[in-house]
Amino acid sequence: MKLIYTEMSYSMTEILVNEARKAADQGYRVFYIAPNSLSFEKEREVLTLLPERGTFSIIVTRFVQMSRYFTVESSPSKQHLDDTTLAMIFYRALMQLKPEDLPSYGRLQNNSVFIEQLVELYKELKNAQLSVHDLTGLDHPQKQEDLIKIIELAETIMIQQDYNQDSPLQSFARAIKLGLLNNQLSKTVVVIDGFSRFSAEEDYLLSLLNNNCQEVIIGSYVSQKAYQKSFIKGNIYEASLHFLQDLAQKYHIKPVFATSNQVFKPAFSRLTQLFEATHDFSQVDWQLQKNDLDHFSLWQCHHQKEEIEHVAKSIRQKLYEGYRYKDILVLLGDMDAYQLQIGPIFDKFEIPYYLGKAEPMAAHPLVQFIESLERSQRYNWRREDILNMLKSGLFGCFDDSDIDRFEEYTQFADIKGFTKFSKPFTINSSRQYPLDFLNEMRQDIVLPLQELFKSQKQLGASLVDKLILFLKKIRLAENMQGLAQSQLEVEKNEEVWKRFTDILTSFHHIFGQEKLRLSDCLALIKTGMKSAQYRVVPATLDVVTIKSYDLVQPHSKPFVYAIGLTQSHFPKQIHHSGLLSDQERARINEIRNYRHFDIASAENSKKNHQTALSLFNAATKELVLSVPTVINETFDDLSPYLKELINFGLPLLDKGKNYLSYDNSDIGNYKALLSQIIAINRQDLIEMSDQDKMFWTVVLRYLRKQLRKQQLELPTSDYRLSTKPLSKEVIEVCFPKGIPLKLSATALTVFYNNQYNYFLKYVLNLNKTESIHPDSRIHGQYLHRVFERLMKDHTQEPFDNKLKQAIYHTNQESFFQQVYQDNAEAEYSLAILEDIVRSTAPTLQLNQNIKVIDQEKNFHLDMGNEILVHGIIDRIDQLSDGSLGVVDYKSSANQFDIGTFYNGLSPQLVTYLAALKQIAPHDINQLFGAMYLHLQDPKLDLVTFKQIDNTLVESIYKALTYKGIFSEVEKEHLSTGAYQTKNALYSNDELETLLNYNKYLYLKAAKHIKKGHFLINPYTSDGKTVQGDQLKAITRFEADLDMAQARRLVTLPAKEKKECFLTLMRKESHL
């Protein structure tokens, strides 16, 4: 064995490559071993350093891959064990144990997290060269007994199913120990680069290689100053020193110092020396030179997005200077926090990148499909799960529009559960859903699912066969191919499909002869899919590499950007959270020779120093270290390592907000510039100098010219809620000339509430989602229908009997039966409605002096050639003197207010009066009024009554009165009925004023509507709060920002309010 160390200013790779070349020139086969996370980059670096740029004598690889070179022909043809297969094996083992067999873990048998921890423990045991029987000294002895039962049973299953329990390194070590590879190894030289420690498995293999190979060469970075130190605790080279010292002591060899021809920039060397002096308690009498600072940058940004954008701009600048993507490395302090943001931002700046991390399959449509399938079976055809399965794009041959239509209907009809999905759809609504088409679609969905879900408990092999048959019926494979829209997506889908088929194969192999329920089968496949990962190799090498900062090696790239280096992530504190605590691992390590667990927490300090040292030397030209103030929406402090750099004299640059400038980094990329222009266009204006204004004026002029060529336009600002008028063509279609505009009292109210709401409802005809469940509209229809029946019954039957008959016959109507007999909630609503009818009906019984002339009367009120007002009058009454009045049933409290009417928000009663005046017989000239009847079950506070007497009854009937507009002429006739006439009497002239002003409101609205320009102007009564419909989700109206756009209502003092509003009405309607 040969141990080599060198300073950080030299290239260890060049030194080791020279050693490898010498061995190769002598005819030896050389294996150049690198850590798993670095083998790809190391291979490229080694080949670059070779004069011939390639050779068959030197193989750059990993320990695991090296073992396959020697054992590929002699290894038994057994099944391969991966994490998903291991999890299934442990699940099967736990299935065979009863809870009482496992005192410590019996309650966790079906827990997926517990199974994952078992998989991790089993892998750790293999790496540590330990068996489950070596787990002595645990906190609770019962834990070891449970683990022995579980793992031994799992290993028995592995043997039965012909799985290879040995790792590739174990098979390699066994072959060496048996002498099967002596001839090959005698002609082999092993060069090891990039390691600072070995696992127990690697350590054991290394001892065998040292005894059988021609030579083993190991290199590591250690300064000569550190190597000569006797006390190394806390030294930045502590990890490497321990590594070399342990190997030197074990193999009785002295490490040698070597140098390379390549020497890196002195700035990095001087920074390293300062860093070393800080941690070995020595002193230096010099500082960083001014030109050294050109190679280092410390950035501070407010949050992650700004930080990534600054990096992207800097990368674009490097490209402008002539460098390539492959010269740049981006390191992440927190991989999870940055992974989702860095991709879209780099795409915006058109920066190709390769993320050096396996992607989880959890977000792939295939996993979502399997999860929805499993949940559909478990939760009995829940609607959300069925729809998610369809929306994955992998079920059947359905267009998006068909799925949307199916979703709309199932939500309307409340289709959920197997019973409702299995029956034909028969309920329809005013929208007239295409039931024939929906039922055909229902059958295409239900039949294959029903065939699969009816599977009883049976052998796993049979369940897999049925699942595969189901997947063929729904054309899963064909749909999977159709998902990809780019070559990259094709490659991703191929990797996901491969993992999916591997999981099915493993399940068939492990559970093929075990009896399982379908729910267990789908749950196991779903768990395997969600935990699986895949990796896609970049199509080109000229990309920016992105990976976690703790995987970096010295001198990796010319330019390195390390971001997210907050106190919480730099240094990293690693802690185990498995089935064994660190204390238990340490006790096991004390009694085992050459076999040990890796305890990451015990090596946090020296490993973090080693990582920081590698990071500070990762670049060969320029290193940028960045820290955000806020990461994951949490404030964080500077890393202690960055504070040390500040003490060395490196300035901390506050990058600030990404304001646009005319620097190359801001305008050098069209796509990024366009996206930032749009972002600025959505923000409040910022102050600019005259030079800035001139520059951006020219840029915007150019951009608009380019956008017009592509038929694009910049969106308007969020806070300028202006609307565009409809085009002439649309106006002609919506409001054709010569045809009166159709309006109603409700439409007029909506218009004066918020013009844009009218546009949505009556021009675009947008409607809220319908539901079969009764709402206020259906409740109102029910009450109207009961009272219509009641008032039509002129028989001599007692009033109570007639009321019962009206309720009974209304309940028997098919529509109300569907609505109110669907479930217990609907039945409860019906019971409340019946109580309201019984409470309100006596009001009708008391008014014996009235006669009901008509009910549910349709009318069309002609207001000239411009407007046709339509509606339905609930009831027309006639008093004993022949005068007519209008009754409108309301399920909520309503009362006519002249101020609300003046502002256009309550035209209903006056509109009904105008319609009644038009349709009344010629011999009847007098109208006694228009009124609301609140259909309710009055609620009284009994605490306010001293005793239960006639006062209580009077209060009930007082709540059940007619409220509205009444003619002063008919005052005497109204006094005997249940009419609330106080402050509600109007003379004939005043009634005429109301009618004329009502016509003026319609004409004014119609004129504005026909112009086709609808404002976003919800009304406000006080100028401080907005009461009108704001439609925030559509208009983004914010009361505190857009109050100026709200329509201010006219309000007058209560004193003489009626007279003042009537005066205003006469003035505005030109009377």
UniProtKB/Swiss-Prot annotation:
GO molecular function ontology, one term from the record: helicase activity
Sorted UniProt keywords: ATP-binding, DNA damage, DNA repair, DNA-binding, Exonuclease, Helicase, Hydrolase, Nuclease, Nucleotide-binding
Pfam assignment, any one: ADDB_N
EC number: 3.1.-.-
Top class in the EC scheme: hydrolase
GO biological process, one term: double-strand break repair via homologous recombination
Cofactor or coenzyme needed: Mg(2+)
NCBIfam families membership: rexB_recomb
Miscellaneous comment in the UniProt entry for this protein: Despite having helicase-like domains, this subunit does not have helicase activity.
Subunit structure: Heterodimer of AddA and RexB.
Function according to Swiss-Prot or TrEMBL: The heterodimer acts as both an ATP-dependent DNA helicase and an ATP-dependent, dual-direction single-stranded exonuclease. Recognizes the chi site generating a DNA molecule suitable for the initiation of homologous recombination. This subunit has 5' -> 3' nuclease activity but not helicase activity.
The family this protein is said to belong to: Belongs to the helicase family. AddB/RexB type 2 subfamily.
Official protein name in the record: ATP-dependent helicase/deoxyribonuclease subunit B
Organism: Streptococcus pyogenes serotype M5 (strain Manfredo)
Taxonomic lineage of the native organism: Bacteria, Bacillati, Bacillota, Bacilli, Lactobacillales
